[in-house]
Regions:
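Conserved phosphate-coupling serine/threonine residues in phosphotransfer and NTP-handling enzymes
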Residues: 63-65
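N-terminal helical cap/lid subdomain that shapes the substrate entry/recognition surface
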Residues: 1-46, 50-57
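Asp-based, Mg2+/Mn2+-dependent phosphohydrolase catalytic module
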Residues: 50-51, 67, 71-185
Length: 185
């Protein structure tokens, strides 16, 4: 859930109010100063993204993060050079679970929804993908369980789990079915 929805949901504060703007700005500062420097990539993320590309996927990232944070996160994950395009909350009027960011990423991929698969780690990702008409594979790396990710075509413990069982994954099945055009993360 993006900040535009989180503050009203949790604290009853509109993100576009004076107070909401100050809170959002400070949240970003705290994240960049205290948390971002300590983040590291999950195991096998780069290998998994390379596998997607080898198989012909166009990798597009759809994130509720601000564009400046997203570029830093992709560098930390070690995949910034492998990503064809991004769509962030900076470029959408509504964040997840609304489908705006996912639809923007899908448009950038050039793929129709039925030929794309999204990879997500929150219930908001699942809802956004389904509302955009895209199949989604869930990963439990976001702190959510398989039960929380209900609606995903399959759920894995993380990128390493997908990579380790790639041949049986929804990504490989799409390739075998001859329906491959793009993938959104």
């Amino acid at each position: 859930m993006g900040g535009d929805k989180l503050m009203p949901h949790v604290a009853g504060i509109r993100d576009d109010s004076r107070e909401g703007s100050r809170i959002s700005k400070r949240r970003g500062e705290i994240f960049r100063e205290h948390h971002l420097p300590h983040l590291s990539a999950f195991p096998l993320v780069r290998d998994l993204v390379r596998q997607f590309i080898t198989d012909g996927y166009t990798v597009v990232v759809a994130s509720s993060a601000q564009s400046d944070e997203l570029s830093q996160l992709l560098k930390i994950a070690g995949v910034s050079d492998l990503i064809a395009a991004t769509a962030s909350s900076s470029e959408a009027s509504r964040s997840k679970p609304d489908p705006d960011i996912v639809q923007a990423a899908l448009q950038r991929s050039g793929a129709p929804a039925e030929q794309a698969i999204m990879l997500g780690d929150t219930p908001y990702d699942v809802e956004a993908a389904l509302r955009a008409g895209i199949a989604i594979v869930g990963v439990e790396s976001g702190g959510w369980s398989a039960e929380d990710l209900r609606g995903a075509v399959e759920v894995h413990p993380g990128a390493a789990g997908i990579y380790g069982h790639y041949g049986e994954s929804a990504f490989a099945r799409l390739i075998r079915a001859g329906r491959l055009t793009s993938r959104i993360s």
